Amino acid sequence: MTEFVVEFGKIVPPMPDGRLQGPAFARNHDAIWTALAPFLRDATGDVLEVGSGTGEHVSEFARRAPRLVWWPSDVYPPHLASIEAWRRHSGLANLRAPQRIDLADLDWTWRRDEQSGGALTAVLCINVLHIAPWRVAQSLIAGAARQLRERGRLFVYGPFKRDGAHTAPSNEAFDATLRAENPDWGLRDVDDLAALGQDAGLPLADIMPMPANNLVLVFARALRQD
């Protein structure tokens, strides 16, 4: 079992149909969608969410962007069950069944179906990198670069450091708590992630400030040179 799993069912008990709820969803989904909407509201193609957790975000965003096909994923079986429960509850035709994707595997892939359009329009990652080893950040960016179409986007939401420093005392305290729980966890620096993206052909294109001292990092797939 991958060691960076956070078990949402321990925070809020599951609903009778198996749906789990994460406390952060109610606080952040509107703000995250506001950041994503200019890119995704009217887009077409396929969007993969990695580390979907409870499945609440992907269900909500699939409702708001019906022209896209949304593909949730996670590594933890109870989360996969919750994602499927949210999918069934939503009744959305553009929300696919969850896939098991382990970002600790550097060669992870998205499994297409006969209706998929090929390369991904976007990859979405919400609140994962600070509760995961550094290799997960490496794997996320390298895998997104492999599987995004030209001009496709990787969106990464969460708390980050900038220029080697925390952006708020609350983030510094949170980082210390995470590292005390697991030395491989902690807030990642934007510059380090930007370097990964540059090396992978997925340069950092935008940094979007968000409420509660969070950011959305937008990486854009470079045009392939033939």
For the regions a language model picked out, list residue spans one by one.
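Class I SAM-dependent methyltransferase SAM/SAH-binding core
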Residues: 48, 60-108
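Conserved Class I S-adenosyl-L-methionine
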Residues: 167-191
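Class I SAM-dependent methyltransferase Rossmann-like catalytic core
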Residues: 2-42
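Conserved class I S-adenosyl-L-methionine
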Residues: 43-53
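Conserved beta-strand signature within the Rossmann-like core of class I S-adenosyl-L-methionine
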Residues: 151-160
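A conserved beta-strand element that flanks and buttresses the S-adenosyl-L-methionine
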Residues: 124
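A short, conserved alpha-helix within the catalytic core of class I
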Residues: 131-144
